[in-house]
Regions:
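Conserved acidic residues
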Residues: 153, 207, 254
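Short, conserved loop/helix-junction motifs that constitute active-site signature segments
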Residues: 150, 168-171, 203-204, 225-231
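Residues in the short beta-alpha loop(s) of Rossmann-like NAD(P)-binding domains
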Residues: 161, 181, 240
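Structural motif
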Residues: 156, 208-212, 235
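Short acidic low-complexity segments
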Residues: 193-204
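C-terminal functional extensions of proteins
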Residues: 233-297
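Electropositive, gly/pro-rich neighborhoods at or near active sites that engage anionic ligands
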Residues: 6-169, 288-297
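NAD(P)-binding Rossmann-fold cofactor-contacting core
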Residues: 173-187
Length: 297
């Protein structure tokens, strides 16, 4: 699953600047404020880069996940290239989280993936409760299964999100899929495929906009949200989007569907063995839906 990168068509303003990486920067500041004086003392205890997901465990016991962007690093097939992609391999343990948070804005997608997993791990302690001002959390809930699809509305999906595509096909009406690699789509989905270059034309027409969380990894989410029309229902899903929701909700996101790590060591062991969500959901991580309860500011 790949996600579009921002281009000039995304620069329509929705009340906030679509600065690349702004959501992550705001979320880090929110976490720093909530955690307080102990923030800078937190270190990374374990890192696992699996086939499907990258996971971390922090010194405070929290764990976090991120999508592993394997397709984005085809050059990492020899030792020098691999070293550039992940120069800290073998030296992750004990590093301060500041190193990983700085890497969120590095050119290497693998460094960014580990950094996002750290942000999700830092967020976990605040997402274990059922609610917080401005939002409510539903543990064990798959946001994709519970999306209310408008019968006649215009639906746009960014990324090859299989569960929602199945439901849209059952609806039997046109929809749009924005996906960088159309080879990830099935034959009956290809007629609805839209090239990334047309994202700026298609997104503003969406009544329901469902976005893969990998857009956060590639710093394209802000531009996409800035392009959505006022009043559109926006759903962001995937393990990558498993962090404090405030910065997302301020930009019009209605629901976030992510994963909450409950047993970090067990989860990382599964990732080491090439495991996917089917192997850890309900065991070492729970799916969750984070719903906005107040209007976007």
């Amino acid at each position: 699953m790949n996600s579009p990168s921002p281009n000039g068509a995304f620069q329509k303003n929705r009340g906030m600047s679509p600065e690349e990486g702004a959501i992550l920067k705001e979320t880090i500041e929110e976490l720093r404020s909530r955690i307080g004086d102990t923030f800078d003392g937190i270190t990374v205890e374990r890192v696992t880069i699996g086939i499907f997901f990258t996971g971390v465990k922090l010194s405070n016991g929290s764990g976090g996940l991120c999508f592993t962007p394997i397709k984005e690093i085809p050059e990492a097939v020899c030792c020098p290239s691999s070293l550039r992609a992940l120069p800290w391999s073998g030296k992750f343990r004990g590093r301060p989280i500041a190193d990983f948070l700085d890497a969120l804005f590095d050119r290497s997608p693998m460094k960014r993936a580990v950094g996002i997993a750290v942000v999700n791990a830092l967020s976990a302690q605040f997402l274990e409760c059922n609610s917080s001002p401005g939002f409510v959390i539903e543990r064990g809930s798959d946001a994709l299964d519970e999306i209310e699809i408008p019968d006649d509305g215009n639906v746009v999906v960014i990324g090859a999100l299989v569960p929602i595509l199945k439901r849209l096909k059952m609806r039997g009406k046109p929809y749009s899929i924005i996906e960088m690699d159309p080879r990830t789509l099935k034959a009956d989905e290809l007629p609805f495929w839209v090239s990334v270059e047309k994202t700026g034309e298609v997104v503003p027409r969406a009544d329901l906009l469902v976005i893969t969380g990998t857009t956060l990894l590639f710093h394209s989410l802000e531009a996409i949200l800035a392009c959505a029309k006022p009043g559109a229902k926006v759903v962001l899903v995937g393990p990558t989007a498993s962090m404090l929701p405030d910065a997302f909700f301020r930009r019009g996101v209605s629901v976030m569907g992510g994963d909450l790590v409950t047993r970090p060591d067990e989860l990382l062991d599964i990732l080491c063995e090439g495991g996917s969500g089917y192997h850890f959901f309900g065991k070492s991580a729970d799916q969750m839906a984070i719903r906005r309860t107040e209007p976007a500011s």
